[in-house]
């Protein structure tokens, strides 16, 4: 835990950006969930005891799957793949976009407490926002009409948003941030990706 606190103090700017992004994701999710509740004529609180317990369970499963990541053979070594979004997607379909964002946040928080960070929070921020770019649109679409057909459409919408956002986020923020963190020219990082 001391190592994590030391990393936080050394990377205050990234931590502040991370916190601002978390707040932004929560606000978007709240607006979408309230809109879906209004359209469907539902008036239940965003959080209740049952939801909080389920958020904890889905987050724990997601964190375990997140820790069991593996490298992608066709990408640079710092890109990893895991299946941690699956339980979060199921949980957000069941409990809404706000619960999905909360699960993403708790997953990353648990991972940081157990494993720490090796990327000065850059990779953790990336995992959170790219995960939210899948979870928020998918669960929002599904929240408006909970049918099998709409679940498929929601997954397609979430995948499209995640792909477009993830690509842009990599180009505009992540790759330059990794370049700065590792002290490598951006061209060298891009060359690592094109080598494979």
Language-model-detected regions and their locations in the chain:
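Loop-helix junctions at membrane interfaces
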Residues: 1-196
